Amino acid sequence: MGKDRLPELLQRSLSTNSSNSSSNGSLLLNVYSGTTEFIIGNTGGNNNSYSVVSQNSHSCSNNNSSTEPKDRSSSKMTQYGSNVDDILNPYTEIRQQLAQIAANLETMNRMAQTVNLRTFNENEMDELHNKNLRLGNQLMTRFNDFKANLPAENDYSLEARMKRTLFYGLHQTFINLWHKNELFLQNYETKVKKNLRLHTKIINSEASEQEIELLIENKTTKLFVDNFLQETEKERQTLREMMDRFNELRRLEKSIEEVHALFMRIQTLVMEQSEVIQRVEFHAQQATLHVDKGADELDQAEQHQKKARKKKIMLIVILAAVLLVLLLVGIYL
């Protein structure tokens, strides 16, 4: 049923303006979204969504039966259904991973609102953050693979424009989603620092900015609970020793995470700027082909020149022989 809707919606994209790649791309994304939502609805056993789509398909068939030109156009577009599926299916997992990142980010936003409550689980927050990092790495690898297999920029066929528009649309969605994730992490860190400053003031322990950073690195964000757990001076001393031992390791871990995030940002910028580099490379390849072709043509011209010289010599010899024969005939006669 989802496949039956694809040719009809793709026909609308073609009938509006075949040369407008942006409008075709937006309609293609709408087709893909509608197909995905329909498949999810069917797997979940939602009969209401199936009936709505059936009614829409029935109304579309009634309208098409009233206008014969639309019927002919619809019959012509059915042959493109498999091609559209081939374009959309490879991006299904990417869309699912983007949805997973968005869901994790929404969950972390809800958890950040309860950071001061007992129900807040910092380990769960770290787990969601690590999941987003893993998904981001996987998506970056997938986008690199799809980027390498995109059609050439000088290919203006409908299928090529669909592939390019779908790729750049999903890639921009990933970039926007990742920017939101980084903004959330910055806001969350600021909120945690603010809470730690407030807690230190309440327990009459003024902490410097460096000490607050150290508390965050050691995931010590609940000073009231920690204060009750550290009932004796021995336990406090043990905690200080443990913090000193793992301080350098935490700093190293944080530095590695920052470098990793920096490399991901650089990789995103490189992908955004790679289009110009690919065009330059394309023109360089074309110039190389033309140079090779010119060399072949020069070789052919040289061969033709040699053949022409041989023909000229043969003609001169023949003419000399004819003149000699005529002279001899004239002398004897």
Curated annotation (Swiss-Prot):
Residue ranges of every copy of the t-SNARE coiled-coil homology domain listed in the record: 239-301
Any single Gene Ontology cellular-component annotation: endomembrane system
Region feature Disordered, mapped onto this chain: 50-81
Residues annotated as transmembrane: 313-333
A single MF term (Gene Ontology): SNAP receptor activity
Keyword Lyase: no
Matching InterPro entries: SNARE (IPR010989), Syntaxin (IPR045242), T_SNARE_dom (IPR000727)
Recorded topology in the membrane: Single-pass type IV membrane protein
Primary location group: membrane
Swiss-Prot/TrEMBL keywords: Coiled coil, Membrane, Neurotransmitter transport, Transmembrane, Transmembrane helix, Transport
Record-level GO BP terms: exocytosis; intracellular protein transport; membrane fusion; regulation of synaptic assembly at neuromuscular junction; retrograde trans-synaptic signaling; synaptic vesicle docking; vesicle docking; vesicle fusion
Family matches, as Gene3D superfamilies: 1.20.58.70
Ranges facing Cytoplasmic side: 1-312
Low complexity compositional bias, start-end: 50-66
Protein family according to the UniProt entry: Belongs to the syntaxin family.
Protein name stated in the entry: Syntaxin-4
Native organism: Drosophila melanogaster (Fruit fly)
Chain's gene name: Syx4
